[in-house]
């Protein structure tokens, strides 16, 4: 099966915390992990691992977006339809507490700069 997925690409910065930061509070985290993420990217990788031939379309920013493209290539996803745009790649700042609950702050970055013309080219 061949799949074309046009979806978000984000870098997830996941911080392990004792509790979620409250208004006015500054807190240190216990650890930081960096993951590839975004609903679209996650779907493409899952489909590829399940045996589908997947092409992903979307956008990343200059520089740090290459990390996401490499992760997708390692999973067997075709990345030729991903555009590199000026500015930052989308990212999420994720707080994760000991119970496994999370709080997420999302910056859309390049995902928010996708144009109708880019969609039409795909």
Tell where the protein language model's regions lie, with residue ranges.
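Glycine-rich phosphate/adenosyl-contacting loop at the front of the ribokinase-like
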Residues: 1-57, 67
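Conserved N-terminal subdomain of the carbohydrate kinase-like
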Residues: 25-26, 49-122
């Amino acid at each position: 099966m061949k799949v074309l997925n046009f979806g978000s690409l984000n870098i997830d910065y996941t911080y392990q915390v004792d509790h979620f930061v409250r208004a006015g509070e500054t807190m240190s985290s216990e650890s930081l992990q960096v993951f590839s993420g975004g609903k679209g990217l996650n779907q493409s990788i899952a489909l590829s691992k399940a045996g589908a031939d997947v092409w992903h379309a979307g956008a990343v920013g200059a520089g740090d977006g290459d990390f996401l493209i490499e992760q997708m290539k390692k999973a067997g996803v075709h990345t030729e339809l991903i555009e590199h745009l000026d500015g930052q790649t989308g990212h999420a700042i994720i707080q994760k507490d000991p119970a496994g609950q999370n709080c997420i702050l999302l910056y859309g970055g390049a995902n928010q700069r996708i144009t109708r013309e880019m969609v039409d080219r795909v």
